[in-house]
Amino acid sequence: FPMLDNGDKVFFILIDNFRLDQWREVKDLLAEYYTFDESLYYSILPTATQYARNSIFSGLMPLQIEKMFPELWVDEDSEEGKNLNEAPLIQTQIERFRKKYTFSYHKVHDSQYNDKLLNIVPSLLHNQLNVVVLNFVDMLSHARTENKMIRELAQSEAAYRSLTRSWF
């Protein structure tokens, strides 16, 4: 937690199912507000949300989560949602490192919750860490295969990137 240890307030924004080519498509929209320090990393496989997001938030590999926190791990065969324990997983990581950070966790999956979140941003500034998961790109990705209208709007990779840019 180097930034938090330095006293910085952090907004960790995770855009689910956001690809590198999509990032490159929208980066210039944010450039006037932010500076970027980019580094490429590799990911665990599979990159399925259940494994990747739970690992990011816990700071552990999936097998470690299952062993250390079985009450927070949902098996692949289960009908239960696989990412319902993200906030508790963040808490476990903070506690494992013996930190006392204040944090909030928000998962945005529709425009109404997005508006609500924007309205409470001033109160979030009191937290040292704020985690925000944006699900639009993931929903768009799934709709691209399941919804004829979205399939027609995003017929090619370039069109898909353009649709992502429009959302931004």
Walk through the language-model features, giving the residues of each.
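N-terminal extension/subdomain marker
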Residues: E25, E32-D37
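His/Asp/Glu-rich, glycine-adjacent segments
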Residues: E32, L45-A158
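Short, charged/polar micro-motifs that form catalytic or ligand-binding hotspots
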Residues: D8-L20, Y42, P46, E157-R161
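A short acidic (Asp/Glu
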Residues: M3, Q22-K27, H142-T145
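Conserved helicase/translocase P-loop NTPase motor core
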Residues: F1, I150-A154, L163-W167
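A short acidic-Thr-Gly-centered motif at the start of a beta-strand
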Residues: F1-K9, V121-S123
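A generic structural motif
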Residues: T35-T49, Y160-W167
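Beta-strand elements within well-structured catalytic alpha/beta cores of enzymes
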Residues: G7-V26, I56, N130-L134, F168
